[in-house]
Regions:
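Short, glycine-/Ser/Thr-/acidic-enriched flexible segments
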Residues: 57-59, 100, 162, 196-199, ...
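A short, compositionally biased
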Residues: 139-145, 204-206, 297-304
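Short aromatic-centered micro-motifs
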Residues: 148, 211, 305
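Active-site lining segments that contact anionic ligands and/or coordinate catalytic metals
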Residues: 188, 205-207, 214, 239-243, ...
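Dual-mode signal for accessory low-complexity, basic/Gly-rich regions
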Residues: 219-285
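Internal helix-turn-beta structural module
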Residues: 257-330
Length: 331
């Protein structure tokens, strides 16, 4: 990677974060320390034109021994200013995960099988996907009311006048989603997520269920109800939704506890507690942005999505003629 940057006339700068070292730093960290660290890295980030993030590790639960309070200090005083506020907004960036045996294990695949899967999902024809997404973007931009029905789910909200954004291989790799945000106080009903979620505290949350009233999560349960409510009590915005997105990558069909993959699952949607994106703003601010996924294909219980009372997707398959180009058989 360094050689390639030099070849095109760039000046590479390298941050090499070892997960074990990061864990030890965070276990006893304090606010003053993290602010100073962020100040240094933020100064460098402001000088950068582009950012390439390559993630990988051998243990996805490395941070499980870090106290929640310390993780929150890191998120608030390092991740938010350096990445969410500077890197995301002001650099040309891309993030991907390097395929490792640990990732293969998460996906319940052999290393060889996962390697083939990895390059297939990452290297699909993004130009074709981008063109196919245009009709969905246009429809979402015209939509007011969204209704989602499924196993343990009966949810309504509005996306009126909040822009829809297509993601087709320009930033996250793999890619394949179209996102917007609900009007902050418009969300009402019940939502049951059926994909496990590995949070940055190293714990895997399962069987997550939220009850919403006027946008706020008023009840939350999971395999560790106390723990998930502690996350949602991080700040006021953590109990409101910052993103609604439809996953359309035809080669990703099951969760593997890696959000770069899981949020793109064909026939899924994610409904994200926490901060919104500037591209699709609904005014919600939080130090968290937690993509939680619900899969609506037949193998995962099915479900229906309606835009302004018109059925647009059933059991993970688009049923409106203008959107059928996004279905798996067209790739």
């Amino acid at each position: 990677m360094i050689k390639e940057v030099y070849k095109v006339g760039g000046n590479p700068f390298v941050w090499n974060h070892n997960p074990q070292i990061m864990r030890e730093l965070l276990k006893e960290c304090n606010e003053e320390q993290i602010k100073l660290w962020a100040e240094s890295d933020l100064a460098l980030m402001r000088k950068m034109d582009a950012y390439i993030g390559i993630w990988g590790g051998s243990n996805n639960a490395e941070n499980s021994s870090v106290r929640r309070e310390n993780n929150q200090i890191y998120e608030k005083f390092y991740s938010n200013p350096v990445h969410m506020h500077e890197r995301v907004k002001n650099t040309k960036w891309v993030i991907l995960n390097y395929p490792t045996p640990s990732m293969a294990q998460q996906a319940s695949m052999s290393s060889d099988e996962f390697e083939d899967f990895y390059f297939k999902v990452c290297n699909l024809d993004y130009s074709k996907m981008s063109k196919a997404m245009d009709n969905l973007v246009e429809l979402m931009d015209k939509t007011d009311k969204v209704k989602i029905i499924g196993d343990g789910t009966d949810l309504t909200f509005s996306i009126k006048n909040i822009k829809a954004i297509k993601c087709a291989g320009e930033m996250n790799i793999p890619d394949g989603e179209v996102f917007t945000a609900p009007i902050r106080e418009s969300v009402n009903g019940i939502l049951s997520y059926n994909a496990p979620s590995l949070y940055n505290d190293g714990f895997t949350y399962e069987n997550i269920k939220f009850e919403f009233k006027d946008g706020k999560i008023i009840k939350a349960t999971a395999n560790d109800t106390k723990r998930i409510n502690e996350i949602l009590d991080t700040d006021e915005g953590a109990r409101y939704i910052g993103e609604f997105s439809l996953g359309v990558n035809p080669y990703i069909t099951k969760p593997m506890k890696d959000i770069l993959f899981d949020e793109k699952i064909m026939g899924s949607f994610h409904f994200t507690p926490g901060s919104c994106y500037d591209e699709a703003p609904n005014g919600n601010k939080s130090i968290i942005h937690w993509d939680l996924v619900c899969i609506q294909t037949e193998n995962y219980g099915g479900g229906e999505i309606y835009f302004d009372d018109i059925l647009i997707r059933k059991n993970g398959i688009f049923v409106v003629d203008s959107l059928k180009c996004l279905n798996p058989e067209n790739y």
